[in-house]
């Protein structure tokens, strides 16, 4: 394992020298912090082409890659092993994934936060491994925020951990079937006060009533042209419509 720059000694009065540093094959497994320390010791780019694995936090690893060829060369195809247990922004993991053609092993992570789109990017990447049992917080919130139920269901299928949507999510969209799947999933925790916009043209009244029971928000059914089901279920649906500003 690369041991920082403990073997390097300043030979002049300045802290940074024009030293040529080449990481030997015996140090193929390096920590991100030690690589950063190395290129901070010299004005000449460090040759790290022998490195096959970098270990460290996502932030530390991204610092190494962000240094660029003027500071460190030979990187771009190594395996990265993360040490984080929690990631407050999944975007940083996606950035790391883009920095190397090697695999990013994120098995250390047990909780992760980010927008639904960025989370789906991470979980859909062939370059990121080790995910699948962590707690997820979906951060989309505020006026204009909207999530597709099908996307939530897709993310739900990729982890055995609990997924929680943020307070203040404005709208959930999708088919009644997809929406009911999302609300009914044990792996998804949805606030339940968001507005709903359905995309179906034909819906079974019982399914629509089930959806209405999941949320205190308004259900927009403007696309609906046909409602099927028993007379009792249809009457319940229209009664709910009359009691709210929903459009059926």
Task: Enumerate the predicted regions with their spans.
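General marker for long, soluble alpha-helical cores
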Residues: 1-248
